[in-house]
UniProtKB/Swiss-Prot annotation:
WD repeats: 14-53, 54-98, 103-145, 151-193, 198-239, 271-319, 329-368, 374-413, 424-462, 602-641, 656-695, 715-754, 769-821
Protein name: Elongator complex protein 2
Assembly, per entry: Component of the elongator complex.
Family, per entry: Belongs to the WD repeat ELP2 family.
UniProt entry tagged with the keyword Nucleus: yes
Main location as per UniProt: cytoplasm
Disulfide links within the chain: none
Organism of origin: Danio rerio (Zebrafish)
GO BP, sorted A to Z: tRNA wobble uridine modification
Subcellular location: Cytoplasm; Nucleus
PANTHER family: ELONGATOR COMPLEX PROTEIN 2
Length: 821
């Protein structure tokens, strides 16, 4: 079998901010909504194995369709803010959208489904249009069976089951009227048979479980309580005894086809201190020829805890068995919870999208486990470190995140993980650039640039997790005077360095004295050094992996928009948003003194992206004014830094682009640069004289060297691979506004009229691409795949890696086989 041209190596993402967005299947796979996609995540391999793209709005609800025999599921239901419900089915090992249920007039917030037969599904969906719709699905077709209207009320969750001893479906709905409504299908239509009262605030979750011929219904509410109800069939011979001294719970009775069913309140569980958003029964398991349901109930709350409840064996009284949760940070609590098929792992997803996983170890203790993480808003920019061993990303979720491959001892498995969150800011992040291996500059929706440098604790942990030699890292980076870590003051935005002395200072209690000042009781530093052998948990990422801020750079009048640094890491260029020429200047900064070197003025509107040439002699800038400018470094005097002067530029009359130019990049040999624009055009520029690096010929004019490539959609990102293909052509990646990534090969030709200089190599398929704008594309600066250094070097020479960042909150890394192009 031929090697694939493009393979997805890593997907970084997190769960959407919705209560019903995560579902753990009997096959061990976790499905969750991330922006407009449904991610299929394997917790054993710790990686996303598939992304299902069909929704055009945020995915709010995901639910596996469980098989009666507890076998791995082949069907999945999702609902989104595009008002649609989609039925996914696994065919030939891949999930595909088999039916789109359209009919709601508002976002879908909850879904559930039950198998009526091997080929028929009953699907329920709740929406903010104040209705619950019932759908039937069979043979790749779905139709609306019934719409249940709730007037001005909203149903927050729905759950379907089959009545004991029958194939009659029963529907539970929990909503903002603080009640749980039960509907049963009678004569083909669902009719309300009972309303269960007791909750004193919105009901956030409902779920059925089937045990020993009885149905158990759990409901959770914003009143911080959980109620467990029991539904059973009443037998005709059952006596109605009124025994003195015995308290009997009230029975709510309804009839279906002449048979009586009763619902009683089994227990009320109080233990959470904030709204309870999610509940989940432990999945049933197969024991011999029968299916057994355990009465263990998991709950998740905004108080940052999950509780596992269950009845005591002796008394039958429901008690709290396990409580786990998140400590520290300024985050809100949990939105939902799930349990693995065998009950050995429990999962929560938090307000900011983070997944929290605990496993039951051999000592019967619950321990945190490694899980994927990602941005919970648009990813705006990213950069590889100069050695290609990690990437740093920034996003509109106000965080900067660092990802690296995790190399396990004695295992060939390599997965990428977030190992540091250098910056947690108060403004949406916009741009960054690396300045050396362990230093970067970032810009946000503020006028200030901030410079960060890695602490000693990060360098040590990076070496342990990535399998890199610590001695090698120490050799390239003088860490003798580096701080241990960083922490953020309670009311501050700047990460303050924490040194060894700050950690070692004894507390007053240790000296036997009393507190003598407020500073003893309320310390500025919350940092604790970590010695990591595996990627950190969300708690540690929030609190113990910050990088100290070493400098602030002032000079811009508006919010930052783009950054670039030269290959020698001596100069940083920055630009901000601008609607006038006076603000559309490029500021150059010295990385030695962090002083402003120069201001370069040419453009009249926002500069959207900049790139230094690989030899560091030229600076390219593209702008919203539809033009580009090229600046050349002069020869430095003995006492002054080299100054940049305008070398070439296009005007509105000479520019080939007719809309905003979004992106630009250089070829590794300095001979060409590329621009991409909203007008769907990608153009390569250089000297008409073949083989001359841009800027070397005094009389040579910079002109377009390629035919105009029309990519069919707004080209929002472009990047040239630093390595040539086997036929000595240049490899380019182009990111589009619709989320697709295209690979092209380009070869300089004398005759451009035939457009044969471009050849299309590969397009991302429906699962590989993004679902929203591609914001940034970056090639790894070295051949090979990150973390595969120990493999046969000749084999690795055939591979390059491409990282992409999208407005769909996702960061992806692709393995691209140069020999297969």
């Amino acid at each position: 079998m031929a090697a694939p041209v493009m393979d997805t190596c890593h997907v970084s993402c997190c769960a959407n901010r919705a209560p019903n967005v995560v579902s753990w299947g009997r096959g061990g796979l976790i499905a969750f909504g991330t922006c407009n996609s449904v991610a299929i995540y394997n917790p054993e391999e710790i990686r996303v194995v598939d992304l299902l793209n069909k929704h055009t709005g945020r995915v709010n609800a995901v639910q596996w369709v469980h098989e009666p025999d507890c076998s791995p599921e082949n069907q999945l239901i999702s609902g989104g803010s595009d008002n649609n419900v989609i039925v996914w089915e696994k065919l030939d090992g891949k999930f595909r959208a088999c039916a789109v249920c359209s009919g709601h007039s508002g976002p879908v917030c909850a879904v559930d489904a039950v198998s009526l037969s091997s080929s028929h599904l009953l699907v329920a969906s709740a929406s903010s249009d104040s209705t619950v719709k019932l759908w039937t699905y069979s043979s790749d077709a779905a139709e609306c069976l019934q719409t249940v209207a709730f007037g001005s009320g909203f149903m927050m969750d729905v759950s379907l089951a089959l009545l004991p001893g029958s194939r009659v479906p029963v529907l539970a709905c929990g909503g903002d009227d603080s009640r749980v409504h039960l509907y049963v299908q009678l004569s083909g239509q669902f009719q309300r048979v009972l309303t269960l009262t007791g909750h004193e605030d919105w009901v956030r979750g409902v779920e059925w479980a089937n045990k020993d011929g009885e149905l158990w219904l759990a409901s959770c509410s914003q009143d911080c309580l959980i109620r467990v109800w029991r539904l059973f069939a009443k037998t005709a011979a059952e006596p109605d005894l009124q025994t003195d001294g015995i308290i009997k719970m009230k029975e709510n009775i309804f009839q279906v086809s002449g048979e009586e069913f009763a619902v009683t309140l089994e227990t009320v569980l109080a233990g959470h201190e904030n709204w309870v958003y999610g509940i989940h029964w432990q999945p049933p398991s197969v024991k011999g020829d029968s299916v057994e349901q355990s009465l263990k109930l998991l709950s998740a709350s905004m108080d940052k805890t999950m509780i596992l409840w269950g009845p005591e064996e002796d008394s039958g009284m429901w008690v709290e068995m396990v409580r786990v949760g998140e400590v520290g940070g300024n985050t809100l609590g949990f939105y939902g919870c799930q349990m693995s098929p065998d009950g050995s792992m429990i999962l929560a997803h938090a307000f900011h999208g983070a997944l929290h996983l605990w496993h039951h170890d051999s000592n019967q203790e619950w321990r945190p486990s490694v899980v994927i993480s990602g941005h919970f808003n648009a990813v705006q920019d990213m950069s590889w470190d100069p050695e290609g061993e990690f990437i740093i990303t920034v996003g509109s979720d106000q965080t900067t995140r660092l990802f690296t491959p995790w190399t396990r001892k004695g295992s060939s498995q390599i997965t990428w993980h977030e190992i540091s969150r250098p910056q947690i800011h108060g403004y949406d992040m916009q741009c960054l650039t690396m300045v050396g291996r362990f230093q970067f500059v970032s810009g946000a929706d503020e006028k200030v640039l901030r410079v960060f440098k890695a602490p000693r604790n990060f360098v040590e942990n990076f070496a342990h997790i990535s399998g890199t030699s610590l001695e090698k890292l120490l050799g390239c980076n003088d860490i003798a005077d580096l701080p241990e870590g960083a922490s953020t003051p309670a009311l501050g935005l700047s990460n303050k360095a924490v040194f060894q002395g700050d950690l070692a200072s004894p507390s007053p209690q240790q000296d036997g004295g009393d507190f003598n000042s407020l500073s003893d009781q309320y310390k500025e530093s919350y940092f604790q050094p970590l010695k990591l052998a595996e990627p950190p948990t969300e708690d540690d990422l929030l609190q113990n992996t910050l990088w100290p801020e070493v400098q602030k750079l002032y000079g811009h009048g508006f919010e930052m928009f783009c950054l670039a640094s030269d290959c020698a890491r001596t100069v940083v260029a920055s630009a901000c948003k601008a609607s006038k020429a006076e603000h559309a200047s490029i500021l150059l900064w010295s990385t030695a003194s962090w002083k402003q070197l120069q201001s370069l003025s040419c453009h009249s509107l926002t500069i959207t992206q900049m790139a230094f040439s690989p030899n560091g002699q030229l600076l390219l800038a593209v702008s919203r004014d539809r033009t580009w400018s090229l600046w050349r470094r002069g020869n430095p005097d003995l006492d002054t830094e080299a100054m940049f002067s305008l070398y070439a530029n296009t005007s509105k009359d000479t520019s080939v682009h007719t809309r905003i130019i979004w992106s630009c990049d250089w070829s590794a040999d300095n001979k060409y640069f590329v621009t991409s624009s909203r007008d769907k055009k990608v153009i390569i520029w250089g000297h008409a004289v073949s083989g001359v690096a841009v800027g070397e010929g005094e009389d040579a004019r910079v002109t377009s060297c390629s035919s105009v490539l029309d990519v069919g959609d707004s080209a929002t990102a472009v990047s040239i691979c630093p390595f040539l293909c086997s036929d000595h052509s240049y490899l380019l990646a182009v990111g589009l506004e619709n989320g697709q990534i295209l690979l092209y090969k380009w070869k300089p030709l004398e005759d451009l009229s035939s457009e044969s200089d471009w050849s299309r190599c590969k397009d991302t398929d429906a699962c590989q691409g993004h679902t929203m704008v591609v914001k940034r594309l970056r090639w790894r600066p070295r051949l090979g795949r990150g973390g595969h250094g120990g493999q046969d070097s000749k084999e690795e020479q055939a591979w390059v890696q491409l990282a992409s960042a999208g407005a769909d909150h996702v960061v992806k890394i692709f393995d691209i086989n140069l020999s297969a192009l």
